[in-house]
Every structure is written in structure tokens, then in C-alpha cells.
Amino acid sequence: VLGLKSTGLSNFVQSAGEHAQKVAPQTMLHRGICETYEAGTAVWSTVCGLKLAGQSEIEPNNEATQAACRIFSTTLDVLESNEELKREVFGPCSIIAAADSLEQMLTFARGLEGQLTAAIHGTPDDLREFAPLVRVLERKVGRIIFNGFGTGIEPCPSMHHGGPYPAASHSFFTSIGTGSIYRFVRPVCYQGFPDDCLPAPLQNANAAGAMRLVDGTLTREGK
């Protein structure tokens, strides 16, 4: 989580840490994921300049592979200079980093690997002011969210759950939504084929009345 260094951001870090203390540990999918989470946050805890802003006060049940919520805080300078902090730790944790300026945020964003989502929280005026950041994120993520979170994924025609590598192996395709069917197909061009040798949906008669693009025009008509 990136924000401009300010009293408001400091208050947010404090509030997030206090809320984390009240969050009960939750069961993760299996022991391997839980152990990787614990190992990852343990590495974070050794980084100089990274502070634990708050964590669940309730002890997790190891037998139930539970993980405790943890919120860390630091500066963007520390985040940029430590590769350990840039590696994903899957689970209920976040690092909140304070940036000195928009330009520093832009520099950091330009160095990001491909991501599934990015969220921007603020007012419409903030969104206009930070338009250069949106332009950078367009090249780094598959879905940009305003005042929302990436966990709400609606399986609808407009949904795109994918992103530039390594977030996905092919950034053109979504794994959620009606467009996800295209992960299982690929285009094939039949050039110069006799009409009767073409697959039925491509034959001039178009007996099934399928929607087709013919000479640049969408139509269900046959010939």
C-alpha cells in the first residue's frame, strides 16, 4: 500500500494496526500455504526500517492452519532498497509505505512486475491529480480499481482477471468472467479453401445462423 507521507497517512497506519489487533486468525487452504506465509512475514520482520504496526492479538490455532493478520509500515525508500519486501507473501498481511512525492511513486510503479490488480483510493479530484500514475498502472496490471478491492471478482462480460507476466502467462486472457472461454481456444485461418471443405460455421450458407464477421460486417446472414 503506497501513500504520500503525511499526517493523514500516519493516522491511517495507526488505525490499520489497531484494527489488525482485533482480526481473528483465519484458516488457510492448507498447511504449506500457512507455513509459507509465516516464513515470509518472519523474513519481513528482520528488515531494518520495517515496523510492525499491528497484528492479531488472538493466538492462531496451528492445527487448523490459521494465520494471524499483520500490518507493517515503512518508507518507500526502504521498500525500494529491499528485494525481500518486493516478493509476494500470500496471506492476511500488508506493507504500508510512505512516499516523499508523486514522482517517487511513479518511479516505483514503473519498476513493478506484472500484477493482476491495482487499487486507487481517494476522491475524483485525487484521481485526476494522479492521472500519471493511472497511465503507468495501465501497463502493469490487468484491472485498475477505484475505491474498491481486488478480491471482489464478478464473473461478468466486462471482468478481466489477468495481467502482464508474471501475473498471467498471457495478458490478453481472463480466468474469470464470460471471456474466460477464450483461454481454451485459438484462432485458425482457412485460406483458399473450397466452401464445402470449411467447418460448417464458416461455410457461406451459415446454416446455424451464427454471428460472423464477413467482409468487416457483423451478420447472421448466409449466402
Mark where each language-model region is.
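A glycine-rich phosphate-binding loop feature that marks nucleotide/adenosyl-phosphate handling sites
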Residues: 1-5, 31-39, 58-62, 124-126, ...
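NAD(P)-dependent aldehyde/semialdehyde dehydrogenase
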Residues: 2-116
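Generic surface-pattern signal
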Residues: 18-21, 25, 42-49, 139-142, ...
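C-terminal core of ALDH-fold dehydrogenases
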Residues: 64, 102-201, 218-222
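Generic signal for short, ordered secondary-structure residues
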Residues: 84, 163-164, 207
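Charge-patterned, long linear interaction tracts outside catalytic cores
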Residues: 208-215
